Amino acid sequence: MRKAGNFQGEYLQDYWAIAECGFKTNGYFVEFGAANGKEISNTYILENQYSWNGILSEPARSFKDELLKNRKCSIDHRAVWDVSGKELKFMENKDAFLSSLYSKENTNTLGEKESYLVETITLTDLLKTHSAPKIIDFCSIDVEGFEYKILKKFFSDGIYSINHIAVEHNWRADGNLLIDLFLENGYTQKYMHLSQRDYWFSRISIST
């Protein structure tokens, strides 16, 4: 697999996604955190070159104006978490691409710039709110350490299916938990030699 065209994904995530989907047009994506929606975005090309629609979630205030300018799909400024309707502390880093909900584990490594409260929403509720189809073609997840609890809740809800998922692990200690969670829910891991700090998974039922 090689990079081509104007793909933005830092580690070929967008190219992998569109290739797995047979370079289809009019697919559906969800991406959180979406940052400014363009720079190293895993869904920008899907929307702008392949006419996909979808949802972006990004609570960082510094990205709000850019995100609205860069993208035409649905945008939600709540933080995806495992519970909806909570207000949690959000840490906006000097490098805004590293901003995240607060946790004891990331407060030292992220380097807090400022903090403020953000409302949370589960992935299932995010999809419901924006009238997403029951089968999502591609999901990109980068939430600096909260991936496992978000996905565990999503899989337990059992309402929506996602065919392909790119989830950043950044070599965190809970990586094996994430892998096991995907395997238990009918996914197979793809291109481990290419995915770098991401895990890429496809649903077995659509990859065989």
Question: Predicted regions: what is each one?
Answer:
Residues 1-208:
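Phosphate/nucleotide-binding beta-alpha loop and adjacent structural elements of enzyme active sites
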